[in-house]
Amino acid sequence: MVLGRDVGGARVTITDVTNGHILATGLQLGDSGDQNQIMRTPRMMEEPIYSSRPSAVFTATLALQKPTFVEISAEGPLAYPAALQKTSKTLLLVPGQDLTHDGIVLHLYGYLVEIEQPRPPEALIAKDDVKLRASVRTLSGSLVRPHGDWDSRKIRIYGEILIGDRIVERLQMFYDEVSRTFEAPFFVPLPTDAPDGIMLRVVAADPAGGNFGVSQATFPVLNERRPATRR
């Protein structure tokens, strides 16, 4: 899928390799593309994958005087700085030879992982049974779930509880169809064991595809709930 407006798009920069001059830069914005067309439609090798239907694209006209080696770089998704990835490709461009069909395609690897529950900086209560819940999506914003185009059964999604730099528990997370998130219960440790609170971390790992994502947040631990403030 394509990094479109739903995830903030991507920044694209075209640089002359010889002298380092920036020839063009801008944002790729638009739709993320037709998932059925991209993921499931059979096609010949020379047929376009992404541009056969409206999808996000960055277009530039370069005033080249001669064949020029350029570096085309892209970084995104811009709406998720914690998951920002960058890639580049070097190629020769020739004046008068416009790129057609899909043009130059750059691939970014990773997942958007977001802890949905508990929400920082929410305090956790010692000995409470708490549910850790997180969403996992591709960088383009497509849902990762069992039996989907991005099948969660083929990757590892797990949670970790950390006290300081030490992992004290690893949690196996399961998909919940109603909330469309992955979840796992855990018990909150005592404040004496975690005086500076705990860190919750969720990891999505696909070593075969080279895609990884992580989200983490720190939570204070209290002995008991604070009384509600009266107004």
Predicted regions and their residues:
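Exposed beta-strand face motif in extracellular beta-rich ectodomains
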Residues: 66-70, 155, 194-201
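Surface-exposed loop/edge segments in extracytoplasmic proteins
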Residues: 18-26, 163-172, 211-212
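Short acidic/polar inter-strand loop motif in beta-rich domains
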Residues: 55, 62-85, 204-214
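Short, compositionally biased P/S/T/A/G/V-rich stretches that sit at domain boundaries
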Residues: 92-144, 223-231
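Aromatic sugar-binding surface patches on proteins
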Residues: 33-58, 176-187
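Short, surface-exposed loop/turn segments at beta-strand-coil junctions that are enriched for proline
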Residues: 187-194
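Sec-type signal peptide cleavage vicinity
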Residues: 1-28
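Short coil-to-beta strand junction motifs in C2/discoidin
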Residues: 4-11, 147-157
